[in-house]
């Protein structure tokens, strides 16, 4: 009888092609997502070597990082570098026979939102993309992670990837989430607990009642930010919630193929007695709405808290780092989080740009107005999300409240397109990174949930969503 295995062990074993004595392994890759930023050199490498894409039907190309989200984007991309990258992806997809969603295709959007929407992402698969937030797809019980440009070329050419196996880590969130606390708060709390290096060398499996109670969209938010916790990939075992989400998607198996897939997917869970190298346990009842205060995703605190004093940190290097963060953020120790005013609000990204996120925002802002001191924008994660939001009338709620309703794309999550902060501007953002300059040169980013961002837009400063009337 074989030893008990974790979910990660099972997916790894099912895709192992070869293993060397030093632990170097060759893994088969089921799905490959590509976008315009990390793929041009990879396709050019194939072209120069005279190679084809080995399995074009297992590759999907989407533009997202560089595309403008303004209503006039049909007029073309003004930035020359961005335009060149987008045009290169269109040309490469055509030359190599890869399916491609252009900025004019309603299926276009952020690659990690598009994959699940299309049923391209399925349980038990290995999924890669030249993007660190590929971990998002782990919400389906898929082993998904980012790869570098040279690896993108390797996967295009061989449909395999050279890797070494990571360690197993379990993060269990027990109990029920209190009102006002969301998946975004869970993952920020986890990163605050383990630090940005806490998952280094591991694949994290998320489990527990609070995780199980989440929708697929909430689970994607959790797995999306696994990389911010230092782990390469995050996993949540598939269940009926997963299967119900997938069933009607365009690329999902149909008929007998569905029944066969379902039988396999139901085996994708960690066996009782399986070994984890590290276990972290949180109690959902203890979790508040969370706001980041510094320039690292681990710099988080309750909305009811105050900016911490770095002098309380024993370790000298870390203490200096946190003082630098406060200086960059223009904050002083002891400042109440609810006293921090914001200039901008960004709602979107592959972390929180899905329809449930937008519904949560609409509940907060309906019948209210964005503060006169705030500029706020909402960027749907895909054309299909935008279409659904407009069918539900959410866009009218947003526009009447004073939000800028945009076209789909990565937008202000990162300063690679026209949507960016000006120096010194402070932003409540539903994205995933608050590094220095992430949203624009000298821009200041606070990571929050969609509901918290929406409330900040109306109030002009951070407020506790639990007290929102």
Swiss-Prot record:
[4Fe-4S] cluster binds at residues 350, 410, 413. One of its GO terms (molecular function) is metal ion binding. Pathway: Amino-acid biosynthesis; L-leucine biosynthesis; L-leucine from 3-methyl-2-oxobutanoate: step 2/4. Its cofactor is [4Fe-4S] cluster. Keywords: 4Fe-4S, Amino-acid biosynthesis, Branched-chain amino acid biosynthesis, Iron, Iron-sulfur, Leucine biosynthesis, Lyase, Metal-binding. It catalyses: (2R,3S)-3-isopropylmalate = (2S)-2-isopropylmalate. Its EC number is 4.2.1.33. InterPro entries: 3-IsopropMal_deHydase_lsu, Acnase/IPM_dHydase_lsu_aba_1/3, Acoase/IPM_deHydtase_lsu_aba, Aconitase_4Fe-4S_BS, Aconitase_4Fe-4S_dom, IPM_dehydratase_rel_enz, IPMI_cat. Binds 1 [4Fe-4S] cluster per subunit. It holds the Pfam family Aconitase. Heterodimer of LeuC and LeuD. Belongs to the aconitase/IPM isomerase family. LeuC type 1 subfamily. Catalyzes the isomerization between 2-isopropylmalate and 3-isopropylmalate, via the formation of 2-isopropylmaleate. This is 3-isopropylmalate dehydratase large subunit.
